[in-house]
Amino acid sequence: MADLNLTLKIWRQDGPTEPGGFKTYDISDLNTHMSFLEMLDVLNENLVNSGDEPVAFDHDCREGICGMCSMVINGRPHGPLEGTTTCQLHMRHFNDGDTVTIEPWRAKPFPVLKDLIVDRTPFDRIIQAGGFVSVNTGSAPDGNAIPIGKDISDDAFDAAACIGCGAC
């Protein structure tokens, strides 16, 4: 449980029509066992205590199943670990003295609402419509009567494991 000191470069933007930019914060004495979102909570507590506005970021379950915590960390969706959501990323994956750049998705369909929060409405509509399948395929056959190869079942499992974060 070592202490960690980081420099954070965080995208700040007041609203969808306002210009945004990176603002730098130093944060110290972080527990390496805390999650990335807990680190942002600590930063926000420090900002509020000093009279500054907290960083707006989206989250819901904090269990890696909802996809609301999506952000880009050091140029990668969700951060340095593949297959790990932002809320499941722990500070032990960073080194003391690191500079961590945090920004919202950079996609035209996801306009920034404030700081790290984006408008996910277009993506949510796709998910509500059943994903990317837009062809009427008729009624479903009996799933137990059709042999499925391992490579196809692996792909299907990957699709079923989607949490709707929008990183794809």
Predicted regions and their residues:
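Signature of N-terminal electron-transfer/Fe-S-associated modules in redox systems
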Residues: M1-A167
